[in-house]
Design a protein with these regions (language model features):
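Inter-lobe coupling/hinge segments of SF2-like helicase ATPases
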Residues: 1-176
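Short, conserved charged micro-motifs
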Residues: 180
Length: 180
């Protein structure tokens, strides 16, 4: 469900009407992701005097003007900086990786590479920081970003999918509809 709707299972759709935390007994839930608007507001408070621009739902910027500033954007709405960005902080990396789809890693890497391509080269001082990626395990999409090697990632994914008989190595059909 959306932010205004009831809490429900992302797999089966079952609505949870009486959530209780098994650790503390609390009943309140909060969003796991803050969102671009709130992130921009918090960065504005953390860095007073530094312009903060936001690009995403409602207003997508094509280009930002030169000069020091913080730019917060949603994936796919990254504006171009004329001299390239000094850095890209890829927030909530886990959120893209934790989606219930076979393509989650591919999609995460595609979005990260698109954002990273807007950053100055490392030789020019550019930096890319994936924040919120799991650190307790190796994550191939993050490794591919750090290595700047999407071909390695694609070959690895294809090998695994062949071994497991998953697309694109095999055909798969999904049937959806109301229960009879």
């Amino acid at each position: 469900a959306g932010p205004q709707g009831p809490t429900s299972c992302r797999w089966c759709g079952r609505v949870e009407t009486a959530f209780t935390c098994p650790a503390c007994g609390g009943h309140a839930l909060r969003s796991a992701v803050v969102g671009a608007r709130r992130t921009a507001e918090e960065l504005g408070r953390a860095f007073p005097g530094v312009p903060v621009e936001r690009s995403g739902a409602g207003t997508v910027l094509d280009v930002v003007t030169s000069g020091p500033r913080l730019v917060v954007s949603t994936p796919g709405a990254e504006p171009v900086a004329p001299e390239g960005y000094a850095a890209a902080l890829l927030l909530d990396a886990w959120a893209l990786l934790d989606r219930p789809t076979l393509l989650a890693g591919e999609e995460a890497l595609r979005r990260w590479l698109a954002a990273a391509a807007l950053v100055r080269p490392a030789s020019g001082g550019g930096r890319i920081v994936p924040a919120g990626a799991p650190t307790e395990v190796s994550v191939p999409a993050v490794e591919a970003l750090v290595r700047w090697d999407p071909v390695w990632f694609a070959e690895r994914e294809l090998t695994e999918r062949r071994e497991l008989s998953l697309p694109p190595a095999a055909r798969l059909a999904t049937l959806t509809g109301p229960r009879a």
